[in-house]
Amino acid sequence: MLLIPAIDLKDGQCVRLKQGDMDQATIFSEEPAAMARHWVDRGARRLHLVDLNGAFAGKPKNEDAIRAIIAEVGGEIPVQLGGGIRDLNTIERYLDDGLSYVIIGTAAVKNPGFLQDACTAFGGHIIVGLDAKDGKVATDGWSKLTGHEVADLARKFEDYGCESIIYTDIGRDGMLQGINIEATVRLARAVKIPVIASGGLSNLADIESLCEVEDEGIEGVICGRAIYSGDLDFAAAQTLADRLRESDDA
């Protein structure tokens, strides 16, 4: 089970939002590259970046901070990025800069042809981010709820050739209410590609619960507010996940 620290970027700073509200941002660091180093030094094996300004603007907005993070840790672990990725040129530029994966969210739902083209052109590097509430997909930085069932879209995007799916329960994100295990497992069972859980991770009990269902196809979990607030010790959590995996394999 990969525990993946999230670095959310707003105006060049590392922040956390409460339920996706740009007006409810807590600044955790003015040096995102140093924050990336912090998590790698504590055992992170992948990083999850979000260009928040980009997500709302529909185009890249934190490229300097993103490049600084890649320069700091990109040679050691995979780095994935979402937010504001709406065209193939942006994907190509980011991959050339050293990103391992780009995450397509709103654009995948609104323009499936773009996702299909991206998967064809950059196979193995495209992750789809599906944000949902009560099983329905949301777009545009969570501001719009669609009528699409998350499992239906996930199967469609799997057919296009995406590498994996990040599933965020937006009713829980940034609220420390616990991962929605049931909904995440339901999605993982609907597809054959890996699912990465997101939204609401709060403590070691959540890690244990996720590890119990890892074999359903859940590859990892995005770690957000809990590792910044101190509710979850990242290094201890990754160690626990590794130990549980080893005991399962034994």
From Swiss-Prot:
Catalytic activity: 1-(5-phospho-beta-D-ribosyl)-5-[(5-phospho-beta-D-ribosylamino)methylideneamino]imidazole-4-carboxamide = 5-[(5-phospho-1-deoxy-D-ribulos-1-ylimino)methylamino]-1-(5-phospho-beta-D-ribosyl)imidazole-4-carboxamide
Subcellular localization(s) per the UniProt record: Cytoplasm
Enzyme class name: isomerase
Signal peptide start-end: none
A GO CC term attached to the entry: cytoplasm
Swiss-Prot/TrEMBL GO biological process terms: L-histidine biosynthetic process; L-tryptophan biosynthetic process
Enzyme Commission number: 5.3.1.16
Active site: D8 (proton acceptor), D131 (proton donor)
Chief location bin: cytoplasm
Alphabetized UniProt keyword annotations: Amino-acid biosynthesis, Cytoplasm, Histidine biosynthesis, Isomerase
One GO MF term attached to the UniProt entry: 1-(5-phosphoribosyl)-5-[(5-phosphoribosylamino)methylideneamino]imidazole-4-carboxamide isomerase activity
PANTHER family, sorted: 1-(5-PHOSPHORIBOSYL)-5-[(5-PHOSPHORIBOSYLAMINO)METHYLIDENEAMINO] IMIDAZOLE-4-CARBOXAMIDE ISOMERASE (PTHR43090:SF2)
Family: Belongs to the HisA/HisF family.
Protein name, per record: 1-(5-phosphoribosyl)-5-[(5-phosphoribosylamino)methylideneamino] imidazole-4-carboxamide isomerase
Organism per entry: Paraburkholderia xenovorans (strain LB400)
